Structures are given as structure tokens and as C-alpha cells.
Amino acid sequence: MPLHNVVVTGIGPVGAFGLGADALSSALQTDQPLAQPATKNQGLGLATDLACEIPADSFKIRDVVPKSHRKAIKVMCPDIESALAATDSAIRHANLRTTTTHPEETPIPDPLRLGCQLGAGLIAADVEELGGAMTVAAPEGVVDVQLWGREGMERLTPLWMLKYLPNMPACHVTIVHGAQGPSNTMTCGETGSMLAVTEAARVIERGDADACLAGGTEDRIHPVQRMRQHLSERLGKGVPFKDTGAVPGEGGAVLIVESLEHATARSATILARVTGIAGGQSPHCTRDGGVPKDDPSFASVMERAIEDAGVSAQDIDEVITSASGVNSDHAEQHAIASILGWSAQDPRITTPAKIFGNCGAGLGALVASTAVLRISQGQAQRVLAFVTGQGGQHAALVLEASA
């Protein structure tokens, strides 16, 4: 059933390109990979040392957190910090008002009608923070679970886990901006932040919120995260449709998903309409993220999003896909070819992950933000945005220009 009441009025992307819609737009126009030798956690002996890091001058966490909440910075991991930066940017881009961005003014929308849906990953603990505990628990180089529970845990600060719970990005975002509407956290790998946008669309469509902060972020350049990718043979140079491995990135995006009535009432600029959504799961995914080229779940999710939008495949002007140089890229391309008849070299297929890397839970929101920019800048009228996760999850959106 097509969505009739859901629009996007702001985006807050953050990544190797910097922070904000203009920064992402410039990077997309340049269309050059931003991967560089990692400046953090070097010398890990991995398949590649390339990474898409957020530039240090992109934002300062103290600038996006009110003074009353700054004590909490000590329990913020990079995933939380980037979520707060992305949210602040999105709110300002949409010209909304919250208790933090406009403390002296009445919030728009009503805090009780402002929801928050964010995707989050398996947040890795700080290596130095865990180092002391691990040393005590593994005196002979092998972890002794008895020592870990009895003595190792005593080396951790009491609040250490508050940095790493997947729902903490949404917790901090809702507290900082006074969002008291429906909230949810999606832990579905790379698809999490796009699924968060689909969740926000449904929340708004059923009338439970006027606007939602939807998206997600993740730090995939953390040494533990990079080691996970290395051990599962997923690291590489990030060449779309080449299966050479992905470049890890950090960042993501938050989108302002709003009801058409609310956006119109406040004379907001409508960047795009959300008209179709879908999600699914591959039953074939292997340890390295591999799936058969003809895995039907890819095409199924794309087709259902198009059907949900009430249009046909011939009405799609462009496809924005998560292809980042991993095995599942071939199945993405096979699905696009079977539905639309487009080859991997077709200029109507955009693969922006080469710009910002694989940001884990932030990837889907960056793909969605790219689609929003294409539409708002008049480069396409109707876009299919698709992302697949390393666990075989899929999500798709159909976004259209405002009538």
C-alpha cells in the first residue's frame, strides 16, 4: 500500500566527506573514493590499512551537546558522538526547533510528537579500557573466565557498559533533543539505519508522530571492528561489483522524516517523498557474507518496495545501492538487471559506498541520504534505494520528488 503522508525535510550525513548535506553533495559530485591509510590504530597487520575516517575538524561533540548534558560525554563512544552530530545537522537542515537547537523558543514539533528510530551496530568496547581487565584474566595468554569474572571485571569503570549498549545512541539523541515520541533501535547490520527510516515512515503514516529522527551511525574503523572484517575476509579496496573486499568507514546519517501535513503547515522545504518501503532476509548468507548470484531475496525486496510505491520498474530513474566490493554485490547487480535490465556499468546505478566506505549500521542511511540529494537537486524524479547487510538482511526505499 503506497505511503501518502511521509516526506523527508532534512538530512544530516556524517562521514569521510565531513558533516552535513552540502559536504555529502560535494563528495558525490566529485565522485572520488575518500579512503586513505588509517591514521588511527595502525599496524594491525590486516588485509588493508585503508579506511574512510571522519575528518577531525568535522565537528566537536561539545558543540552539539548542551551544557546540561556534557557530563555524559565521558560515556559516549564514537557511534554515539556521530549520531548526535548527524542529528544536530539534520534538525538544522530541516529548520526544526528542539530544546537544544533553539532553547529559548517553542519546540517544533511538539516533543511528544517527535519520534526517534536509529540503527545501531555491535559496538566494540575501547581496547585500552578493556586492556587492564584482559591482562588480569589472561595471565598465560588464554582467557580464564573465572579470573575474568572475579578479578578482571573489577578493573572496569562502573559505567563502562553505557558506552556500548546498542540503544545508547537513541537514548542520548532523545534526551538531548527532548524527543518523547515513539522510539526504537534497529540492530540489523548495514540495513539497520534504512530499516529505521521505514519504521519512521510507518509511525508517521499511522499518526503516532509528526516527525521522526531516523537513521543511524557506526564506527567500523575501530580496531576490533576492522579485525572482525579481516578475519571474515571482508576487507579490501571497496570496488563495487568486484568482490575485492570493503573499505571500513565511520559515520552514517539521520534523516528528518515528517508527515506531509506537518511539513506543509510549517512551510518546510520538502526534499523528497517516501512512497515505498520493504525489507527482507536472505536464507543463503554465509560467514563471509556470500550469497548465490541469483538469490531471489534481493529482487523480492526491490520489487516489493516498487509495488508498495504503486509504480512499475519502468518508472524508476535511478538506483542507489550499497555495493561496496563484497560478495553480495553480484546478487545486487543480478537483481537490478532482472528487474530493470540495467548492467553494472549503467550510469543510472550509483554506488556511493566508495566515497564513505562501509559504515555498518550507518550505511543504509547514507544510501538513503544520497537518494534524497539526487531528488532534491533535480537529478531524478523517482529513486530506488537499496542496502544489503553482511548478515543477509535487505532494505529498500522508493523516494520521489514532491508534486
Regions found by a protein language model. Name each.
Residues 115-119, 187, 212-218, 257, ...:
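Short beta-strand segments
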Residues 5-9, 33-37, 235-311, 317-318, ...:
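Condensing-enzyme catalytic core mediating Claisen C-C bond formation in acyl metabolism
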Residues 138-156, 198, 202-205, 218-265, ...:
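Glycine-/small-residue-rich "gating" segment that lines the acyl/pantetheine channel
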Residues 47-56, 219-240, 254, 279-300, ...:
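Active-site-adjacent elements of ketosynthase-type condensing enzymes
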